[in-house]
Amino acid sequence: MPSASFASTEEDDITDHLVRAMREVKTDPESPGWADFYEVHEQRPQNFADKSGKRRPKMDIEFERNARGPRPRLGFEAKRLGGRHTSNGYLGEEGLAAFLEGYYPTSHGEAGMLGYIQANSVQFWSEKLSAELTDARERHRFVDWYVRPRIQPTARILHFDSQHMTQAGASLRMIHLLLSFH
């Protein structure tokens, strides 16, 4: 997947290409054995007692364990970063806040955010998002870092984890993955 070709691509199109690539890895006979135990879903409707049919929220990407027994799910919401796509979208009600407010359910206290970087650097967005999380702790229900951002100036991918409290008072570990597409 040549990342530069996605510099102005819509969020759903990038997500589609990522999910296709992950599914190709799963079907490759040379893939590691752990790949057999997980399924990846795109735009998967979430089940709620008070929402049904088309009114159910849809998770951009969801990983599900497919072995017998409990089937934990790890959902990711994706947001573009760059130009008119700001950190407000990433952290706001259709991004991080959707997990914190219970709009998106979690099965085991973990969820993720994907940042599709289409302008500026991974370092720029990491610093911006980190500062906004710590400067507005109450708004983002930010508690602490599990894994702090470790910046490498030439990085095209960056991962960090943050700890939050949901509106219901449960601890939530957020996995942040920033991917450069320019």
Predicted regions and their residues:
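Active-site-adjacent loop/helix micro-motif of nuclease/hydrolase catalytic cores
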Residues: P72, G83-E94
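Conserved beta-strand segments of the P-loop GTPase G domain that flank and frequently precede/overlap
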Residues: E77, L114-Q118
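Residue-level detector of short, conserved catalytic/binding motifs and their immediate flanks
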Residues: P57-M59, L74, A111-G112
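Conserved N-terminal substructure of TIR/SEFIR domains
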Residues: L18, P70-P72
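Active-site metal-binding core of divalent-cation-utilizing nuclease and nuclease-like domains
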Residues: D36-P70
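C-terminal tail/extension regions appended to the core domain(s) of diverse proteins
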Residues: M1-D12, L18-W34, H85, G89, ...
